[in-house]
Regions:
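Short hydrophobic/aromatic helix or loop-helix immediately within or flanking a transmembrane segment
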Residues: 70-107
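Loop-to-helix entry region of an early transmembrane alpha helix in multi-pass inner-membrane enzymes
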Residues: 94, 106-120
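Transmembrane-helix signature of polytopic, membrane-embedded enzymes
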Residues: 128-145
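Alpha-helical transmembrane segments and terminal signal-anchor/GPI-anchor hydrophobic tails
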Residues: 67-76, 97, 198-314, 359-365
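Membrane-interface alpha helices of multi-pass inner-membrane proteins
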Residues: 177-201, 304
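Multi-pass, polyprenyl lipid-linked donor-dependent membrane glycosyltransferases
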Residues: 140-141, 151-166
């Protein structure tokens, strides 16, 4: 466990390290050619160093509820399994329950969180490697610089595990294998039902135009009757955790504000615009990209319907975890700009700057 860094600076230290890596990548994009073999080797080396740092730094963090949210809650649940206390066993989904059962028998709580970090980060690495081959680092860094990445590796751990397995499942070549991984993802957190539903819809309706119309329609709908929609959803599901996301206002200083989050909407719109620009404006034809873009737009539109809820960021995460892929994918698959690597470097810099300002400088939660 890493104890030499004060807890109050632990998360900020992570962002400063990532800032340094982003800065190096930004400079590299201005002075080097992406296709150069030596440059690709250097980028891969930086990527592996970043991967190693994240695994160690996230996985060996101290157990603290004050600074890492639900980390302390999961430590209590783990200790219940360790001591055969059955009180917590019916409160977690089957994949996470299986993980707890195995880990509690052979390791301590700190090692358990390290395993969680591996299961959270490595699927993103493997997915980046599978989709982008030698350019994997640029996709990976877009994923780990997302505004929600650190939070869902240290706070909403089950959500993070579920979405990482979902992304990994998307890379599989057969529908059967994809669905198997989606079932595993669902077993970590039921909220991943939303992107899974989006995936199933794309099997029949993989046309971005329809999803875009739905996305834009949800904005005025949410402004006018969003609260009524929240009441309807909470009544249908009758889930205490879901209802607390809608109505709990006792911990707003630690989470998000209530009200229509125009800042979150603007952040989400970057992905909506990116996909529209490449698919519609630049006529980029790629079935996989069209699919993940449609899933993103669908999940984000559903979040807009409940954007006024107390924990709006947790619903937004069900689309935000794909945002980095939506932005970077076309850049690594087809030539669109004269100095495309330099353009991508600028976008990466702007993308992480937004995250850095919100998380480190002002703190959006």
């Amino acid at each position: 466990m890493i104890e030499f860094i004060p807890l109050e600076y632990y998360t900020k230290f992570y962002y400063f390290i990532v800032l340094f890596v982003v800065f190096i990548t930004f400079i590299n994009s201005k002075v080097a050619f992406l296709q150069d073999r030596n440059n690709l080797k250097n980028l891969s080396l930086v990527g592996f160093l970043l991967l190693f740092f994240i695994l160690i730094y996230m996985g060996l963090r101290p157990v603290s509820g004050k600074y890492f949210g639900d980390t302390s809650t999961y430590s209590f649940i783990f200790n219940d399994y360790k001591t055969d206390n059955i009180q917590s066993r019916d409160n977690v989904e089957y994949s996470f329950r299986f993980l707890l059962q195995i880990c509690s028998k052979i390791m301590g709580v700190n090692a358990f969180f390290f395993v969680c970090a591996i299961l959270y980060v490595m699927p993103l690495y493997y997915a980046s490697k599978k989709i982008f081959n030698q350019y994997w680092f640029l996709a990976f860094i877009m994923l780990v610089t997302s505004m929600s990445f650190w939070s869902y590796g240290t706070n909403g751990i089950r959500n993070g595990l579920a979405t990482s397995f979902f992304i990994y499942g998307l890379t599989k070549s057969t529908l059967r294998t994809q669905l198997i991984w989606f079932v595993i993802a669902f077993g970590f957190h039921k909220s991943v039902t939303l992107p899974i539903l989006g995936f199933l819809l794309t099997l029949k309706f993989n046309t971005p135009r329809g999803f875009l119309i739905f996305w834009f329609s949800c904005i005025p709908f949410s402004l006018l009757i969003g609260s009524s929609f929240q009441n309807l959803i909470s009544g249908v599901f009758e889930d205490d955790r879901l209802n607390s996301y809608f109505y709990n206002t006792t911990q707003l200083s630690e989470f998000s504000k209530i009200g229509f989050r125009w800042d979150f909407l603007a952040y989400s719109a970057t992905g909506v615009f990116a996909g529209w620009y490449f698919i519609v404006k630049r006529k980029f034809e790629d079935k996989f990209y069209t699919k993940i873009y449609s899933i993103y737009v669908f999940a984000n539109a559903c979040w807009i319907l409940v954007i006024k809820s107390a924990f709006s960021n947790r619903f937004a995460y069900l689309s935000w975890f794909m945002l980095g892929l939506i932005i970077v994918y076309p850049f690594l698959k087809q030539q669109f700009f004269k100095n495309q690597y330099a353009v991508l470097g600028t976008i990466l810099g702007a993308y992480f700057t937004f995250t850095f300002i919100l998380e480190v400088i002002i703190g959006y939660r």
